[in-house]
Design a protein with these regions (language model features):
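CBM-like carbohydrate-recognition segments
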Residues: 4-49, 63, 67-68, 79, ...
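Alpha-helical solenoid scaffolds that mediate protein-protein interactions
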Residues: 19, 60, 73-76, 80, ...
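A short, Lys/Arg-enriched amphipathic alpha-helix followed by its capping loop at the start of a domain
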Residues: 56-64
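Extended ligand-binding groove/face enriched in aromatic
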Residues: 70-72, 82-199, 204-208, 314
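Extended ligand-binding clefts on enzyme/binding-domain cores
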Residues: 149-153, 157-262, 269-280, 294-322, ...
Length: 366
């Protein structure tokens, strides 16, 4: 369908309102290991969905200069930091990415010590697997000797962002290392897509699930890593090759609606919009910055259509799968419930904002 720039801007306004208005409804009971209640829905909680959401807001603010949005972001961090930060793990690191990107642009003195302390502790103390990968420990579970593709977005991008902004290459070096280790064990050489996880204890990829959102973390993650930090030329070339292989596979699996399924290669699994938004963002951005052909852009625009079709009048993105643990069979992924979330909102925001960066016959009209 033809989409105007005005339509995209209106949808973006609704998405921001929908995200900041999210509240847990008691549907999910997921207590943390320290006994505190886990809240992966409400905007005011410090967790990974909110961290991804804030990254989307910071990227949107950086593009628009919206002072009201900036105030919302800074107020969120001021309140959460004053209340006391949670224990460090992979998922509680996610909000640090948006804070780093905000600090990189504004250099607020109050945020720099928080960022530096967290980044230093990640490198020094975050549990590692064999070969030095970050073990995917989260607030409610220890995942011994496991690599998950989510970790690259939740942790490695923060290290790259803050390392570049602070002039400390050791953090960028660690981000590079994590992308390389995770690619070694999670990238499927046969399909070009990525498996959800790897266990060093069993030395296998669990269900060998080619999971949609997990793959979108990689698409977004590689492109944003290259965009935000000066990484080694050899690592850059290697990761771009990995990305090209992934996208070649994705282009063959896009549904007629423009969406992708939660199990990318399984036509019986449902179409899932957070993954679709991440792929749309990556495809449009990759084409715009000259890393891919026009085919990427056209597939990204079809994904943009699919995302817009799932933004409700209340600004809430529909058909987003809830937070997904490691599955030991493929049915596990098919059965994940659909639930509005901060990351669903954020990935949609990233996709729509990138759509505005791609002027064409679909988005130029006012």
């Amino acid at each position: 369908m033809a989409v105007s720039a005005a339509h995209i801007r209106t949808a973006l306004d609704r998405l921001v309102a929908g995200m900041t208005g999210l509240r847990a409804d008691g549907r999910f009971d997921e207590p943390n290991l320290d006994g505190t209640p886990g809240d992966y829905v409400s905007f005011d909680s410090w967790e990974w969905p909110q961290g991804v959401g804030l990254y989307g807001l910071v990227k949107l603010w950086a593009r628009t200069g919206d002072e009201g949005l900036l105030a919302t972001i800074e107020d969120w961090y001021d309140r959460r930091i004053a209340a006391g930060l949670p224990p460090m793990n992979v998922n509680t690191t996610a909000p640090m990415l948006a804070l780093s990107e905000l600090w990189r642009r504004r250099r607020q003195p109050r945020f720099e010590p928080v960022l530096h302390d967290w980044a230093s502790r990640v490198v020094a103390t975050m549990p590692r697997t064999p070969e030095g990968g970050f073990q995917h420990n989260v607030s409610d579970r220890i995942n011994d000797d496991e690599l998950w593709d989510d970790t690259l977005f939740m942790v490695a991008l923060f290290l790259a962002s803050f390392g570049q902004a602070s002039g400390e290459p050791r953090f960028v070096d660690e981000a590079e290392r994590q992308f390389l280790v995770h690619a070694r064990y999670l990238a499927d050489t046969r399909s070009g897509l990525w498996f959800h996880g790897w266990t060093f204890r069993g030395r296998h990829n669990f269900a060998r699930a080619l999971w949609g959102r997990g793959n979108s973390w990689i698409t977004v993650g590689i492109l944003d890593l290259i965009d935000m930090a000066q990484i080694s030329p050899s690592v850059r070339a290697y990761l771009l090759g990995v990305l090209e292989a992934q996208i070649a596979a994705l282009l063959k699996l896009q549904a007629p609606s423009g969406a992708w399924r939660t199990l990318l290669d399984d036509p019986t699994s449902y179409e899932e919009i957070s993954a679709t938004a991440g792929f749309g963002y990556g495809l449009m951005k990759g084409a715009r910055i000259g890393l891919g052909p026009a085919e990427w852009r056209q597939a990204g625009l079809r994904a943009l259509d699919a995302v817009l079709a799932n933004v409700g009048d209340d600004g809430v993105v529909a058909n987003v799968s809830y937070g997904t643990r490691m599955g030991h069979d493929l049915q596990f992924y098919r059965d994940i419930p659909l639930q509005p979330t901060g990351y669903g909102q954020a990935l949609a925001i990233l996709c729509l904002a990138e759509g505005l960066e791609n002027p064409n016959e679909m988005t130029e009209a006012a």
